[in-house]
């Protein structure tokens, strides 16, 4: 007969040392009552009085009778120690007559000797291991106790579950299915029971329980078959390991028996229990991403002079499009796409490398003096000497000075007559300064994408040990790669608008991902690095950005959709947590993105997520402002725009808009399509259906039908989604609250933010 698979839920009470049903707990305790019997021979405690001499014959007969009973009940040689697991028990002495017995068709009676560690017979395996086993009579073992206290009402529940009749909610969450080899070697209680959540009982709603009770064969055989057990930590005992005291796994801290937490804990590499495309999950709950790298990057390691390779590059360059930074526009047809020339004459608009240390020091001084009202005359002008109330804001005194400097230089370059150099470019260059080619390399002849103001090209150069630390971008060990974005004003656009847009976009990106600490917080790894802004000719500029070789989320979802799949729920949860963490960092620095969508989310091969494109970002709070500035008017891409943005003359909080957009992005990851095209009831029937269901039933069928490998996390996720998609922004959850929700708290992320922030 095939195995009966069951779903599992964690229901361990905080007061019980074992997470399973009370019947097993009682059985184990009765099986291993402290004993004074050793080697099946009863002994007399030294504290007991000797029997009268006159009764010696009766005593001898009694001993012989007991020996005969024990010998007949065994019927098999003693169990080898190598075939059992060890448990920690009490060491009190009790009479031999109260010895519990274990009866089985395959195993003899085991009487526990007087020792700190007792032995579990192999026939307990069927009870301690996963209940998803064959119910064959020959493979089943029974447990019989000498006392009547062993039997309880929960015994029947456990028996029903073992036969496939019990409720799934009675079983611990995250219980892994072990292979036949694992079952033969790993049946200790510590390994058979869940160890992740020891104290919190799980309470499920009716809809979730009903869903779990369905026997959906298609779902059982799907790629999500792993369920909640992918998140538990279970270490299997090696085959060559004898179950001695030193080899016992670490016990649970609330165990009522002898503590073994101080004993040696055997670390074993977790095995992969799920592999879906470029995503792996291990039995300890950890996971790894291995996203595809753009073919152009792989080909860069080969000989670039080979004609065959060059032809292949030209064919493959359109497979990925970094539309996250470089959005497609109708006006692109009027943009000059000719190759960039004379880049070695480009002049950076940023402070020189020599002055960067001074710039960083002034930033820290301005932050440290914010609480005292003090000011530094060299860093903060007189009109900005008032006390700063928000030292963590991305836009402070130094950023304001840099904005003024960049605006002046950009306007000077734009207004300069054709063929003439701006005053900034006429200045004598520092002879020690590195040229553009030395810093960022040469063009690889590949256009990554098209933007509103020009094209984006891929540049690369050989990596060296002397590379500046601030040039943090993708490196494959041989070459460093950079994305170079060209910025040219369109003939139909006012020069002031062009200057304001590129200045604000660069300043926001540059200040957000600055490597130095500001206001006690370190840079976020989920914000793309803006490395440089240079003037290359009269009215033309280039922006150098960190290169992400795995493309954007839009292309990842597009490839998945072509295969008829979507992101795995655990993978989507990890990306969602990274996205929320990056947005939280922006909000804590007074900046809202206002255009979050898959095209604006980039990836590195290891799954590191990067938020980019700050062209429409909103600075809602500077260093001198206590209150948040609200916005009016719709900003961003329609499927991801919150409903309040379409209300005429409505002042909305840009932070809550970002939260709505994050929710739409997540649903796109797990569903593979948009929820709706426009969040307006009168214009989109899909959104109208959502609004009516939420208003009348407080439910949305799309959220109710979403699946997850872990049913408890699925329930928590559903609660969070309902809080995100509140049409009324006053009732909507914030990014900070969402990151503190049970859903995100129970979401494993591949990024260790504690290490980064330390």
Curated annotation (Swiss-Prot):
Query: Which InterPro entries is this protein grouped with?
Result: Kinase-like_dom_sf, Prot_kinase_dom, Ser/Thr_kinase_AS
**Which parts of the sequence belong to the Protein kinase domain?**
442-744
The active-site annotation reads 595 (proton acceptor)
Question: How is this protein annotated for GO cellular component?
Answer: cytosol
Q: Binding of ATP: at which residues? A: 448-456, 485
- Enzyme category, top tier: transferase
GO MF terms, alphabetically ordered: ATP binding; protein serine kinase activity; protein serine/threonine kinase activity
The Low complexity compositionally biased stretches are: 129-153
Reaction catalyzed: L-seryl-[protein] + ATP = O-phospho-L-seryl-[protein] + ADP + H(+); L-threonyl-[protein] + ATP = O-phospho-L-threonyl-[protein] + ADP + H(+)
A Pfam family annotated for this chain is Pkinase
The Swiss-Prot or TrEMBL record describes its family as follows: Belongs to the protein kinase superfamily. CAMK Ser/Thr protein kinase family. NPR/HAL subfamily. HAL5 sub-subfamily.
Q: What is this protein called?
A: Probable serine/threonine-protein kinase HAL5-like
Instruction: Say which species the protein is native to.
Output: Vanderwaltozyma polyspora (strain ATCC 22028 / DSM 70294 / BCRC 21397 / CBS 2163 / NBRC 10782 / NRRL Y-8283 / UCD 57-17)
């Amino acid at each position: 007969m095939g195995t009966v698979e069951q779903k599992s839920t964690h229901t361990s009470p905080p007061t019980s040392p074992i997470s399973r049903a009370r019947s097993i707990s009682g059985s184990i305790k009765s099986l291993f009552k402290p004993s004074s019997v050793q080697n099946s021979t009863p002994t007399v405690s030294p504290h007991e009085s000797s029997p009268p001499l006159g009764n010696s014959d009766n005593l001898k007969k009694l001993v012989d009778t007991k020996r005969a009973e024990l010998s007949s009940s065994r019927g098999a040689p003693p169990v080898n120690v190598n075939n059992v697991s060890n448990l920690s028990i009490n060491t009190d002495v009790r009479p031999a007559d109260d010895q519990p017995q274990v009866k089985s068709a395959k195993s003899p009676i085991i009487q526990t000797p007087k020792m700190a560690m007792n032995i579990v017979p192999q026939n307990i395996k069927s009870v301690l291991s996963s209940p998803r086993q064959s119910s064959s009579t020959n493979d089943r073992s029974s447990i019989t106790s000498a006392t009547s206290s062993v039997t309880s009402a929960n015994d029947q529940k456990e028996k029903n579950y073992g036969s496939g009749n019990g409720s799934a909610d009675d079983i611990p969450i995250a219980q892994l299915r072990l292979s036949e080899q694992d079952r033969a070697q790993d049946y200790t209680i510590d390994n058979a029971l869940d160890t992740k959540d020891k104290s919190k009982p799980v309470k499920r709603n009716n809809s979730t329980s009903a869903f779990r009770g369905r026997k959906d064969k298609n779902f059982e055989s799907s790629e999500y078959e792993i369920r909640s057990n992918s998140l538990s930590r279970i270490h299997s005992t090696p085959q060559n390991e004898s179950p001695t005291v030193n080899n016992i796994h670490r016990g649970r801290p609330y165990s009522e028996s002898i503590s073994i937490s101080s004993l040696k804990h055997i670390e074993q590499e977790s095995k992969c229990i799920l592999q879906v495309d470029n995503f792996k999950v291990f039995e300890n709950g950890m996971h790894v991403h291995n996203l595809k790298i753009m073919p152009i990057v792989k080909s860069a390691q080969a000989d670039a002079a080979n004609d065959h390779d060059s032809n292949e590059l030209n064919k493959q360059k359109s497979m990925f499009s970094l539309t996250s930074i470089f959005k497609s526009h109708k006006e692109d047809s009027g943009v000059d796409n000719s190759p960039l020339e004379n880049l070695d004459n480009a002049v950076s608009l940023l402070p020189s490398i020599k002055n960067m240390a001074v710039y960083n020091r002034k930033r820290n001084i301005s932050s440290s003096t914010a609480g005292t009202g003090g000011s530094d005359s060299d860093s903060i002008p007189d009109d900005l000497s008032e006390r700063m109330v928000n030292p963590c804001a991305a836009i402070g005194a130094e950023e304001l000075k840099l904005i003024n400097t960049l605006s002046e230089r950009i306007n000077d370059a734009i207004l300069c007559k054709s063929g003439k150099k701006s005053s900034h470019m006429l200045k004598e260059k520092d002879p020690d300064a590195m040229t553009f080619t030395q810093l960022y390399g040469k063009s690889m002849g590949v256009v990554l994408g098209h933007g509103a103001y020009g094209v984006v090209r891929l540049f690369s150069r050989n990596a060296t040990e002397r590379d500046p630390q601030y040039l943090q971008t993708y490196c494959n060990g041989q070459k460093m790669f950079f994305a170079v974005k060209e910025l040219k004003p369109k003939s139909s656009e006012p020069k002031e608008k062009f200057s304001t847009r590129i200045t604000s976009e660069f300043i926001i990106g540059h200040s957000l991902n600055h490597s130095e600490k500001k206001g006690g917080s370190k840079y976020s790894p989920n914000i793309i690095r803006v490395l440089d802004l240079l003037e290359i000719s009269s009215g033309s500029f280039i922006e150098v950005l960190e290169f992400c070789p795995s493309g954007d989320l839009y292309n990842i979802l597009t490839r998945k959709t072509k295969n008829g799949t979507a992101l795995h729920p655990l993978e989507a949860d990890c990306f969602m947590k990274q996205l929320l963490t990056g947005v939280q960092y922006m909000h804590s620095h007074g900046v809202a993105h206002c255009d979050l969508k898959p095209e604006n989310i980039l990836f590195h091969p290891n799954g590191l997520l990067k938020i980019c494109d700050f062209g429409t970002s909103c600075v809602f709070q500077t260093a001198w402002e206590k209150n948040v500035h609200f916005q009016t008017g719709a900003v961003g891409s329609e499927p991801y725009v919150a409903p309040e943005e379409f209300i005429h003359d409505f002042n909305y909080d840009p932070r809550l808009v970002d939260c709505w957009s994050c929710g739409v992005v997540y649903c796109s990851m797990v569903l593979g399509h948009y929820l709706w095209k426009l969040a307006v009831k009168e214009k989109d029937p899909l959104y109208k259906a959502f609004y009516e269901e939420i208003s009348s039933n407080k439910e949305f069928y799309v959220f109710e039908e979403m699946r997850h490998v872990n049913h408890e996390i699925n329930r928590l996720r559903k609660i969070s989604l309902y809080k995100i998609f509140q049409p009324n922004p006053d009732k909507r959850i914030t990014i900070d609250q969402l990151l503190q929700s049970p859903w995100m708290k129970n979401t494993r992320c591949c990024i260790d933010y504690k290490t980064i922030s330390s």
